[in-house]
C-alpha cells in the first residue's frame, strides 16, 4: 500500500513541483503538498490510490 506522510500539512502555499499522485477520489493531485492539503481538508477520508496520474 502506498502511503504519504502528511504530518507537516496543511501548508499555505504549495510549490509548482510536478510529481502527480492519484487520490482515492480518482483526482490527480499535482504534488504531495496539494494532495496533503486535500487530505487535511477531507478530515483524513482521502487516501492515496497510487503514485502517478489517475
UniProtKB/Swiss-Prot annotation:
SMART domains, alphabetized: KAZAL
InterPro entries for the chain: Bifunctional_prot_inhibitor (IPR051597), Kazal_dom (IPR002350), Kazal_dom_sf (IPR036058)
Residues that carry a glycan: 43
Query: Positions of the site: Reactive bond 3?
Result: 16-17
Spell out the subcellular localization from the entry.
Secreted
Report the domain of life of the source organism. Answer: Eukaryota
Which residue intervals define the domain Kazal-like in the entry? 4-54
Report the Gene3D superfamilies cross-referenced here: 3.30.60.30
Keywords tagged on the record: Disulfide bond, Glycoprotein, Protease inhibitor, Repeat, Secreted, Serine protease inhibitor
| CC per GO annotation | extracellular region
Spell out the disulfide connections: 6-36, 14-33, 22-54
Q: What is its main location?
A: secreted
Give the Gene Ontology MF terms in alphabetical order.
Answer: serine-type endopeptidase inhibitor activity
Free-text note regarding domains: Avian ovomucoid consists of three homologous, tandem Kazal family inhibitory domains.
State the protein's name: Ovomucoid
Instruction: Give the source species.
Output: Vultur gryphus (Andean condor)
Amino acid at each position: 500500500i502506498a502511503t504519504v506522510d502528511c504530518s507537516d500539512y496543511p501548508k499555505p502555499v504549495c510549490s509548482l513541483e510536478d510529481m502527480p499522485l492519484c487520490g482515492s477520489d480518482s483526482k490527480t493531485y499535482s504534488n504531495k503538498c496539494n494532495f496533503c492539503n486535500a487530505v487535511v481538508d477531507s478530515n483524513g477520508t482521502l487516501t492515496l490510490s497510487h503514485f502517478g496520474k489517475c
